[in-house]
């Protein structure tokens, strides 16, 4: 797992905890902040996955051209 992916997973967990705490306490602002943090972190994770896939495809093409 890449460092960026690990960081995204930690941010997702943190956002989920904030969202859950907001739901439990009725703090809509904390709940919303947690949801946004979690969603942004998931987007970063998906971007990192796409980057890795493209790098893998480029490497495969380079190998075939040798």
Curated annotation (Swiss-Prot):
- Superkingdom of the organism of origin: Bacteria
> Where is region (Disordered) located?
1-23
Biased composition annotated in UniProt, kind: Basic and acidic residues = 1-10
Task: Please name the SUPFAM superfamilies in this protein's record.
Answer: Hypothetical protein YjbJ
Q: Name one Pfam family in it.
A: CsbD
Describe the family membership recorded for this protein in Swiss-Prot or TrEMBL.
Belongs to the UPF0337 (CsbD) family.
Query: What is this protein's name?
Result: UPF0337 protein SPy_2005/M5005_Spy1709
Give the organism the record lists.
Answer: Streptococcus pyogenes serotype M1
Taxonomy-wise, where does this protein's organism fall, top ranks first?
Bacteria, Bacillati, Bacillota, Bacilli, Lactobacillales
